[in-house]
Structure formats: structure tokens, C-alpha cells
């Protein structure tokens, strides 16, 4: 059953032949239906465990997931790295990540060639910073401390990826900067 408190659950046990009330540890997570208190499931792997969610395992569509007011491609991992803070990481292919960086670092109205230069710089930066925040459970953060990344964007037409910024990413796919073999 579903109970609001441990006490309510224990009270319900009195009418059953056997049973134990089990709760989550300090590393447990409740996955709830967005905008409600309805628990879809609980997850607890203890310290060091993580929950991974991939919204479309078929690859048939361009599925996007909302998180903190923004839409993202790819999947997410959820884990408690330390204390009570939940670390949420968007896991996706590099080129999808670049599409979600270009427009937030520069804006989506810049000319195509400027956005292409930004795409190459952003790709170079993230590859040089792999595992930079490894102790926290991710490679790079999504703020201006690393690179501003907001995925597919919000509902604002003037803020987020555009056809031009997506084109800049695709036309420079795989290109990075090199200097003295590094």
C-alpha cells in the first residue's frame, strides 16, 4: 500500500499476518508524477548507486525530457554523490550537447559562420574538460563556470537553439581545435 507516514503503515500492519515497514536510506529517491505528489516508484541503491532514465529506448523519435524549466535530449542519471543533494546529469551524444551550448554561449541570432566558430570552440572545450567535475559525478557543469548549457531550451522563441545554431553544429560535427598536438 501507499502510506503518508511510517506510523500509518505500521498501524495497517496490525491487520496482516506478517510484514515489515521498509523505507529508503539517505540515498533513496522518490520518482513522482510531475506536478503531483503521486509516487511512481521508489529507488534506493545505497551509497554509490545511480538511477538512469532514458525516455525513448527505440530511438524512433526526438524525445525530450523537461527538467527545471528546460527541455533536454538524451537520458538522465540521478544519484546522491554526497549528503542530501541529488546530482542530476543529462547523458547524451556530444553533438546533441553542442547544439545545446552554442546558442546559450552566444545567442541564436548570430551569423552562421560565427555560430560555427562557437561550435568548434565549445566542442574543443568540453573534450579538454572531460571528467573535470568527476568527483561530483559528471564531466562539466551547465553554468558559465564551464559552458552554459540548457538543452533544447524553454518555450521562449528568442532563447535557445535555432535552425541556424543547429546547422552550425551539424556542419562542424567532429571538428576541434589543435595546437602543438594538443
Describe the residue ranges of each PLM region.
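Conserved, single-site charged/polar hotspot
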Residues: 1-182
